[in-house]
């Protein structure tokens, strides 16, 4: 049997077993760590690559993460509002190195402390909940106390600047990323290689065969992972029908990052989703000191997408990327870094060549104009401008952020370019983060406020407003990382 078929089956078996025992292990570990460390003799000074398997495990590292997340959405007058509060925790363990090899595993569980009935659509617009359900299991709204997932189970080899990791892991790529804006992140299952052959060059390559999107508890093949979230409407104006209808053997990723000059870097990415579409990105960024206190920053970005074969399905009604379709995106950023300020003005343009498409299940937009709680996936002929400013109060261990953007979208009835029937809108994000010190070091508290409203004076039917515009979203998050 081909290795690309054997490995997913093996890791799926491991996932099933680990999901059943992870919560028990987490509980036992929490209550026995103190006693274990008191009763065991002092370990011998660690030695690298010892022949002792016991040493490999004892020299491993544990990391924990507990999170409290409370969210509420205040929709336009007459539309249903929502609120939810979740709590969760997880553990990660990585063994010590044995001739460069190590094993890592980690998992997470979530509980619903209190929430609105997230299964009820708004009675006026018939729109379903969009934000709060993401704290839990988006596929099973009734699941409140059995939300757990094996997130990491991998074998890693590292030698100097070369690292290869195979198995379940967390992503960090422009188009497939953790999008950690709910309780847990998106995970990937595959092979990733990182190599830095020189001081100024970084290479990355990967082959992915499964993805576990944020707000889910299962692992899905690449085709299955597209369409788990609401999928909007097709270019023909009919509801998108590609869920469980796409075929793909996996995702191939390659990138190079080059430091051209101390003040200039360039990165090139190519992401090929077999049988569906290809995405290429070139991004250049610079940082030029103006004086001892001030640095000029900026960047340029170009993205090109093209359909592969029939875009995922030979039936046009069930395909993801229209046969022969393409999209082009370009953007830029210019800013000043003057401690404690970091300010930038950003621009994104999606041309009329076609919809920019990237599964929302896979990650957030890489655009300079991105602000939390909204995406520009699914749109064509878009112009966006955003101002971002952050201010660090080092003595108060705090950081403030302000983001304001205007996003000019096609008409809501222009189905060829407006997949989610969203009006042009303006968005304001305000956030505050505080890092605790001393006894509570490792804990932070964050507050995020988001408001979106229609641009212009045009009136819209409720179905174009609910959970989209003329609404506010409130978030209170507490993290403890140890």
What does each model-identified segment do?
Residues 52-73, 101-105:
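Transmembrane beta-strand segments of Gram-negative outer membrane beta-barrel proteins
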Residues 62, 99-103, 161-165, 200-203, ...:
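Repeated loop/turn-to-beta-strand initiation elements of outer-membrane beta-barrel proteins
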Residues 64, 89-95, 153-157, 191-195, ...:
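Residues on the lipid-exposed face of transmembrane beta-strands in outer-membrane beta-barrel proteins
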Residues 113-117, 204-254, 294-367, 451-469:
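Outer-membrane beta-barrel translocator/channel fold
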Residues 468-482:
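Outer-membrane beta-barrel "beta-signal"
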């Amino acid at each position: 049997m081909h290795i690309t078929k054997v490995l997913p089956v093996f890791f799926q078996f491991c996932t099933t077993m680990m999901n059943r025992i992870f919560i028990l292990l987490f509980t036992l570990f929490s209550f026995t760590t103190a006693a274990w460390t008191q009763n065991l003799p002092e370990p011998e000074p660690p030695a690298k690559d010892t022949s002792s398997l016991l040493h490999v495990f004892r020299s491993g590292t544990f990391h924990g993460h507990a999170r409290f997340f409370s969210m509420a959405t205040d929709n336009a007058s007459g539309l249903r509002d929502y609120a939810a509060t979740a709590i969760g925790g997880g553990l990660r363990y990585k063994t010590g190195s044995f001739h460069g090899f190590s094993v890592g595993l980690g998992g997470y569980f979530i509980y619903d402390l209190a929430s609105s009935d997230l299964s009820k659509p708004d009675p006026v617009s018939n729109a379903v909940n969009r934000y709060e359900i993401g704290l839990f299991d988006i596929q099973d709204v009734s699941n409140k106390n059995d939300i757990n997932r094996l997130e990491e189970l991998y074998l890693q080899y590292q030698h100097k600047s070369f690292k290869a990791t195979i198995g379940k892991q967390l992503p960090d790529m422009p188009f497939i990323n953790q999008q950690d804006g709910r309780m847990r992140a998106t995970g990937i299952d595959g092979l990733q290689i990182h190599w830095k052959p020189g001081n100024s060059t970084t290479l990355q390559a990967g082959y992915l065969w499964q993805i576990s999107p944020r707000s889910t508890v299962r692992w899905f093949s690449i085709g299955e992972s597209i369409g788990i979230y609401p999928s909007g409407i097709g270019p023909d104006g009919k509801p998108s029908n590609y869920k469980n209808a796409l075929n793909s053997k996996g995702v191939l990723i390659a990138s190079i990052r080059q430091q051209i000059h101390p003040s200039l870097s360039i990165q090139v990415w190519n992401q090929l989703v077999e049988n569906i579409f290809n995405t290429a990105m070139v991004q250049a960024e610079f940082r030029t000191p103006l004086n001892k206190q001030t640095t000029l920053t900026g960047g340029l970005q170009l993205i090109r997408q093209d359909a592969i074969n029939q875009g995922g399905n030979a039936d046009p009604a069930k395909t993801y990327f229209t046969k022969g379709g393409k999209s082009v995106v370009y953007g830029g950023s210019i800013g000043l870094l003057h401690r404690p300020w970091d300010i930038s003005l950003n621009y994104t343009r999606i041309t009329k060549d076609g919809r920019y498409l990237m599964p929302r299940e896979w990650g957030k937009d890489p655009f300079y104009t991105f602000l939390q709680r909204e995406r520009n996936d699914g749109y064509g002929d878009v112009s966006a401008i955003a101002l971002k400013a952050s201010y660090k109060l080092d003595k108060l261990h705090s950081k403030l952020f302000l983001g304001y953007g205007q996003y000019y979208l096609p008409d809501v009835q222009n189905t060829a370019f407006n997949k989610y029937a969203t009006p042009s809108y303006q968005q304001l994000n305000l956030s505050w983060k505080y890092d605790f010190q001393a006894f509570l070091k490792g804990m932070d508290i964050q507050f995020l406020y988001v408001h979106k409203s229609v641009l212009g004076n045009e009136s819209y039917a409720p179905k174009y407003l609910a959970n989209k515009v003329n609404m506010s979203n409130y978030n209170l998050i507490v993290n403890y990382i140890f």
